[in-house]
């Protein structure tokens, strides 16, 4: 009897312990159901906390891309209702999740990135600057008119200190005309140099209009640097004079002798260019020096 009574007491104690454990387990699901991380069923409502991740702000409806492709059980992805009216073969359907992601540097809920200078702002600043320059020019003109300056409105047509542009300006008329003239004379460009687009060469060596001495002897220059032909135009296409007919061989090949003996160009007194190319179609003979 004692053994049966002890067994009954142990069985009763175990039954009480199991009942208490079952009661405590029934009370816990109400607390943990709101923070459960298990995916809900197909008919269960979505209980996802739509907060931005801690790495960066991606917008109100933006979500990070999930590297794993789980279209059926991806409860972290976008709502299936967003793509319900699209075909599965469309490009946007394939890249819909990627295209609807907010950029990593998204500023604000529906805002855009900050642009420091816009086109409208630059146009406004440009107009303000032009208006300020006009006011300064008008103010300067009025001050000069009030001071009685007669030179207002005069257009100078010569550069006061040498060549200062394509069509230089004259020095302003005043008491320093002589000084300006001397300054212009001293600031001339050197001999045989270009004085601008509309300028001319210095007149001190006008009779030396030949190419300078160089190793290449230029294509249209002459070999001698300071040979003076009295400003005559020496031809290249001149003809032989009748007095030099005796130099021919007599058999009608007088013109061919220059092909065999080209030095006759230098020795013969004819209308050929004595030393290189010195013209194109002139007719005047070269004067003997």
Curated annotation (Swiss-Prot):
Keywords assigned by UniProt, alphabetized: Amidation, Cleavage on pair of basic residues, Neuropeptide, Secreted, Signal
Signal peptide stretch: 1-24
Subcellular location: Secreted
Covalent S-S links between cysteines: none
GO cellular component terms given for this protein: extracellular space
Propeptide residue intervals: 25-49, 285-289
GTP-binding listed as a keyword: no
Modified residues (Valine amide): 155
Region (Disordered): 28-80, 156-175
Residue positions where Asparagine amide is found in the record: 95
Main location: secreted
Gene Ontology process terms (BP): neuropeptide signaling pathway; positive regulation of hindgut contraction; tachykinin receptor signaling pathway
Bias-annotated ranges (Basic and acidic residues): 62-72
Residues found modified as Arginine amide: 61, 110, 167, 198, 237, 281
Purpose of the protein: Tachykinins are active peptides which excite neurons, evoke behavioral responses, are potent vasodilators and secretagogues, and contract (directly or indirectly) many smooth muscles. Stimulates gut muscle contractions.
Family: Belongs to the tachykinin family.
Protein name from the UniProt record: Tachykinins
Organism: Drosophila pseudoobscura pseudoobscura
């Amino acid at each position: 009897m004692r053994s049966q009574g002890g067994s009954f007491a142990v069985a009763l104690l175990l039954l009480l312990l199991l009942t208490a454990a079952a009661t405590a387990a029934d009370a816990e699901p109400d607390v943990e159901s709101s923070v459960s991380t298990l995916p809900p069923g197909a008919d269960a409502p979505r209980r996802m906390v739509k907060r931005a991740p801690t790495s960066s702000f991606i917008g109100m409806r933006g979500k990070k891309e999930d590297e794993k492709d789980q279209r059926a059980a991806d409860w972290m992805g976008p709502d299936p209702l967003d793509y319900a009216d699209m075909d599965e073969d469309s490009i946007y359907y394939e890249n819909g999740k990627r295209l609807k992601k907010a950029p990593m540097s998204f500023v604000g809920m529906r805002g855009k990135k900050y642009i420091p200078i816009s086109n409208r702002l630059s146009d406004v600043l440009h107009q303000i600057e032009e208006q300020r320059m006009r006011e300064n020019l008008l103010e300067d003109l009025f001050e000069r008119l009030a001071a009685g300056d007669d030179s207002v409105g005069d257009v100078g047509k010569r550069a006061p200190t040498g060549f200062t542009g394509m069509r230089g300006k004259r020095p302003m008329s005043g008491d320093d005309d002589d000084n300006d003239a001397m300054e212009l004379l001293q600031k001339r460009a050197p001999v045989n140099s270009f004085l601008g687009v509309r300028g001319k060469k210095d007149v001190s060596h006008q009779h030396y209009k030949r190419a300078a001495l160089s190793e290449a002897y230029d294509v249209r220059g002459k070999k001698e640097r300071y040979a003076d032909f009295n400003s005559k135009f020496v031809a290249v296409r001149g003809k032989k004079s009748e007095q030099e007919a005796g130099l021919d061989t007599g058999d009608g090949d007088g013109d061919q002798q220059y092909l065999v003996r080209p030095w006759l160009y230098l020795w013969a007194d004819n209308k050929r260019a004595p030393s290189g190319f010195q013209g194109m179609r002139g007719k005047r003979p070269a004067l003997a020096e």
